[in-house]
Each structure stands twice: as structure tokens, then as C-alpha cells.
């Protein structure tokens, strides 16, 4: 059984027991969170597709960790001008463990 849900403007395909990195959520570590914007639920041959969401379906998860991702370097290089600009960015994330899919 797996489900596709939306969080932080992105869609995630998850199954029970899986650990997923999402955009930062303002929830403390160890707390439970429910995602009710479930777009699709597949249970064997039974496929439920929402228009746009599946009514009554939700994905239940537990927050495992909060953190920042690896550094991404942004470089602007101007040829023949002896000029360049360098910048770095680390995106915040929330790691959740999927504990249940209800449809």
C-alpha cells in the first residue's frame, strides 16, 4: 500500500514505515502530524485517485528530526572581468516517519 500526498508545494510517494524529508514544518521532534491532502491511494489492485484530493484519506507521520541540508554553492562568474561572486545556501528540512495511511 502506498499513497501520494502534497506538502510544501511538493508531492511525495510514501509507504508505511518510510522516512521522508519534507520542507520545514513548525512541529517539534517526536510529535505526530497528519497530512490530509492525499492525491492518490493504492492498495493492491484498489486505486483511489482524488479530484483533487481523496475524500477521507490521510497520511499519519511522526517527526523524527529537524535540520539543514547540505550546502549549495551559487557562483556568478564574469569572464574577462576579474570578477566573481560566491554565495551559499542551506535549506531547512523536517524528517518524518510514515506511521499509517488511512483511506
Curated annotation (Swiss-Prot):
It comes from the Bacteria. SUPFAM superfamilies: L21p-like. One of its GO terms (molecular function) is structural constituent of ribosome. Keywords: Ribonucleoprotein, Ribosomal protein, RNA-binding, rRNA-binding. Signal peptide: none annotated. The keyword Cell membrane does not apply. GO terms for biological process: translation. The keyword Ion transport does not apply. GO terms for cellular component: cytoplasm; ribonucleoprotein complex; ribosome. It holds the Pfam family Ribosomal_L21p. Part of the 50S ribosomal subunit. Contacts protein L20. Belongs to the bacterial ribosomal protein bL21 family. This protein binds to 23S rRNA in the presence of protein L20. This is Large ribosomal subunit protein bL21. It comes from Actinobacillus pleuropneumoniae serotype 5b (strain L20).
Amino acid at each position: 500500500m502506498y499513497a501520494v500526498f502534497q506538502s510544501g508545494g511538493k508531492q511525495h510517494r510514501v509507504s508505511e514505515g518510510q522516512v521522508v524529508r519534507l520542507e520545514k514544518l513548525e512541529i517539534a521532534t517526536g510529535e505526530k502530524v497528519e497530512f490530509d491532502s492525499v492525491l492518490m491511494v493504492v492498495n493492491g489492485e484498489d486505486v483511489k485517485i482524488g479530484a483533487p484530493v481523496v475524500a477521507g484519506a490521510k497520511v499519519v507521520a511522526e517527526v523524527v528530526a529537524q535540520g539543514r541540508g547540505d550546502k549549495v554553492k551559487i557562483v556568478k562568474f564574469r569572464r574577462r572581468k576579474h570578477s566573481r561572486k560566491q554565495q551559499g545556501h542551506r535549506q531547512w528540512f523536517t524528517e518524518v516517519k510514515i506511521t499509517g495511511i488511512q483511506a
